[in-house]
Amino acid sequence: MELEELGIREECGVFGCIASGDWPTQLDVPHVITLGLVGLQHRGQESAGIVTSDGSAVPKFRVHKGMGLVNHVFTEDNLKKLYDSNLGIGHTRYATTGKCELENCQPFVVETLHGKIAVAHNGELVNAARLRKKLLRQGIGLSTSSDSEMITQLLAYTPPQEKDDAPDWVARIKNLMKEAPAAYSLVIMHRDFIYAVRDPYGNRPLCIGRLMPVSDVNDKEKKSSETEGWVVSSESCSFLSIGARYCHEVKPGEIVEISRHGIRTLDIIPRSNGDPVAFCIFEYVYFARPDSMFEDQMVYTVRYRCGQQLAIEAPVEADLVSTVPESATPAALGYATKCGLPYVEVLCKNRYVGRTFIQPNMRLRQLGVAKKFGVLSDNFKGKRIVLIDDSIVRGNTISPIIKLLKESGAKEVHIRVASPPIKYPCFMGINIPTKEELIANKPEFDCLAEYLGANSVVYLSVEGLVSSVQQEIKFKKQKVKKHDIAIQENGNGLEYFEKTGHCTACLTGQYPVELEW
């Protein structure tokens, strides 16, 4: 909740779809992409865009982009502009670089020596300033302030060894990876192909799904030989709604070609100096939808384990466990189960307060959280509450909630946070406030419970988060046993994590790549 309210926002969502078999297809590609983007709406609410193609030798790209939520941008009339297509890619955006305006909406389309390409990007380039200067020195004009346009221009650059009649897209993508080590997941459309690309550090997620016949979608045991198409997405959460079955993640550094005939890996680019993988650990904590799959495990399950670990690290005498709706609910359930306390709802959220809410006047601003939450006071009068939240960023939203609960009859309110304190900005695709704005870096942090008005405040440790994320991951290459990554009394859980690969830069200040800022 704190993340959403106070500035830590999801990055972007990318999606692609290609029909299999004979073309023109009967598959409604624009609607599949739209539903896929609706499933990724939590990753970006500022703008949305779709580019489709018929996949012919001289393909016609159809483009529609707009500001706002997916369902507002893609009305039935707007979707008609994208018909007669066999493949396409889409994007939902939240600005991490570049202003929030239509010119920065993705996907970007650019003409190359071998025809048009369309590119959708999730992430943020760690060396964007240097790359911008390099492109401008080469005489390549940039029309937006988005680093995603720079990626598109780098892909349009013709490698010296490429022949005029034989485009080498693998070489172009490898050149991009050489110029920009992180952080990005990309979907690239050219003629009758879609390329799915993940940076060598695997910082941002990307996965592939198979569109099934409707009769086979819900039968997981049935191994159908029929395939209606392929999809690629930042998360797997929308696959069920479009009739797709999760296949696998795109590996760090992998270049995957998706065509009407199937999928194949073209290359896997290694990390320099044997660096570890650096998948963003906050995808598990907050950004991803709980029904998404990362590293062969469901996000919901990881959050539940975080709650259990938090109960081990920070037990407290109380009568019930609850949560600030609603991303912290799995952690709250895990905490309640581990410490044997009932899980009880104490707040209900007004789901329609958000970006479409009428701008409040002074009186409504003074009411603060009262317009966002209702209080279920009959559930907690005279009782001690353990309130679980996913994070506390600045602290000026959780404090009014604590006050509201106490004024409504709570005897005590103990705050337990299912992630460690955020101390550092992210420069790899997440919009985090400046270091000075973060509550963990302020003098008030030393007496946080008093500052917030709570009876106690405890965060999950970094080691506890890492253990919760990694305890079920199957490290096939390393042949790791579970007990090797458990938290030990000497604190070597974090030491082992550094060998296995999750980015905790916002928690520890240890960035996986050198930053050029």
Swiss-Prot record:
Residues 12-261 form the Glutamine amidotransferase type-2 domain. Mg(2+) binds at S327, D389, D390. It catalyses: 5-phospho-beta-D-ribosylamine + L-glutamate + diphosphate = 5-phospho-alpha-D-ribose 1-diphosphate + L-glutamine + H2O. The keyword Translocase does not apply. Gene3D superfamilies: 3.40.50.2020, Glutamine Phosphoribosylpyrophosphate, subunit 1, domain 1. The modification N-acetylmethionine is found at M1. GO terms for molecular function: 4 iron, 4 sulfur cluster binding; amidophosphoribosyltransferase activity; metal ion binding. Pathway: Purine metabolism; IMP biosynthesis via de novo pathway; N(1)-(5-phospho-D-ribosyl)glycinamide from 5-phospho-alpha-D-ribose 1-diphosphate: step 1/2. InterPro entries: GATase_2_dom, Ntn_hydrolases_N, PRibTrfase_dom, PRTase-like, PurF, PurF_N. Its cofactor is Mg(2+); [4Fe-4S] cluster. Residues 1-11 form a propeptide. It is an enzyme of class 2 (transferase). PROSITE patterns: GATASE_TYPE_2, PUR_PYR_PR_TRANSFER. The active site is at C12. Its EC number is 2.4.2.14. It comes from the Eukaryota. [4Fe-4S] cluster binds at C280, C426, C503, C506. Catalyzes the formation of phosphoribosylamine from phosphoribosylpyrophosphate (PRPP) and glutamine. PANTHER family: AMIDOPHOSPHORIBOSYLTRANSFERASE (PTHR11907). In the C-terminal section; belongs to the purine/pyrimidine phosphoribosyltransferase family. This is Amidophosphoribosyltransferase. It comes from Mus musculus (Mouse). The gene is Ppat.
